[in-house]
C-alpha cells in the first residue's frame, strides 16, 4: 500500500534550557537559575529572536517574574526585515492560571497571551491580549497540548521557543511536540533529589523514551552548547497521530 507523507500542522518547537553539569535547571529551592554566562544569555536571546512565540510555565514566571526580550539591534533588524513584530508573543502556559498579577512581566513591553483551561480562563483576562483554551477531555484541569499547538499554528505561530520549566517540557515530549533541543551545560554541580531537571513529569521507560540526534557541540569558555533534533518517524496517512 502506498503511503502519503503528511505535513504536521503544528508549530516547530525548540526547547532552550541551561543546566548544571549534573543536569539540574535550578537548585533544590527552585530559585531563579542565573548560573548561565553572558554568552549563554546571548545564545538564548538569539534563539528567542527566531521564534514567533515563546512558551513557559507558570512556575517559571513565578520564579523569574519577567521574560527575556529581544534587545540586540541586529536581531531586531532581522525580525523587522522578515516582516515579524519586534518581539515574539510571550505565552504563559498554566491549567489553573494562578499567577502573580503583580509580576514585572505584566508591565514589560511585549505581547502577552495565556494558554489555559476553561477554569483558568476566568483569571487575569485583563492582563493578556489573547486567552487560548485547550482543555484535556480526561482531566479538565490540564491542557490538551495537541489541540493547543494546532490553535497556535492556525494563528500563524509557526516557530516556538520553549523555555521551561521541566513539567512543561515533559508534557510536550509526551505529546510528541518537541522538534529540537538546545542544552547549555554550565560548570557547576547543584545536586539534590528535589532540584528540577530539564524534563520532569512521570518520566519515560527506556524502551519508549524520545530519541535524539546530536546536531552540534559548541564549547564556549567553560560552557558547552548541545543541539539535538528529536528523531521521529515521517508522518504518513498510515501513522497519522490521532
Predicted segments, located by residue:
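Enzymes that bind and transform nitrogen-containing heteroaromatic metabolites
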Residues: 1-242
Amino acid at each position: 500500500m502506498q503511503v502519503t507523507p503528511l505535513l504536521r500542522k503544528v508549530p516547530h518547537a525548540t526547547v532552550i534550557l541551561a543546566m548544571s553539569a549534573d543536569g539540574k535547571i535550578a537548585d533544590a529551592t527552585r530559585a531563579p537559575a542565573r548560573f548561565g554566562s553572558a554568552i549563554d544569555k546571548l545564545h538564548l536571546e538569539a534563539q528567542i529572536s527566531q521564534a514567533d512565540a515563546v512558551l513557559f510555565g507558570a512556575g517559571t514566571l513565578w520564579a523569574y517574574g519577567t521574560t527575556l526580550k529581544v534587545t540586540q539591534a541586529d536581531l531586531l533588524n532581522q525580525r523587522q526585515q522578515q516582516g515579524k513584530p519586534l518581539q515574539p508573543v510571550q505565552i504563559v502556559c498554566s491549567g489553573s492560571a494562578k499567577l502573580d498579577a503583580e509580576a514585572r512581566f505584566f508591565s514589560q513591553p511585549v505581547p502577552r497571551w495565556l494558554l489555559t483551561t476553561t477554569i483558568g480562563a476566568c483569571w487575569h483576562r485583563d492582563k493578556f491580549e489573547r486567552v487560548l483554551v485547550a482543555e484535556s477531555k480526561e482531566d479538565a484541569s490540564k491542557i490538551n497540548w495537541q489541540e493547543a499547538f494546532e490553535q497556535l499554528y492556525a494563528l500563524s505561530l509557526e516557530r516556538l521557543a520553549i523555555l521551561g520549566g521541566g513539567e512543561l517540557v515533559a508534557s510536550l515530549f509526551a505529546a510528541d511536540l518537541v522538534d529540537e533541543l538546545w542544552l547549555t551545560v554550565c560548570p557547576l554541580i547543584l545536586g539534590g533529589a528535589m532540584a528540577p531537571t530539564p524534563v520532569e513529569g512521570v518520566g519515560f521507560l527506556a524502551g519508549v523514551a524520545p530519541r535524539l540526534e546530536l546536531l552540534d557541540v559548541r564549547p564556549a569558555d567553560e560552557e558547552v552548547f548541545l543541539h539535538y533534533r528529536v528523531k521521529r518517524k515521517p508522518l504518513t496517512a498510515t501513522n497519522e497521530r490521532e
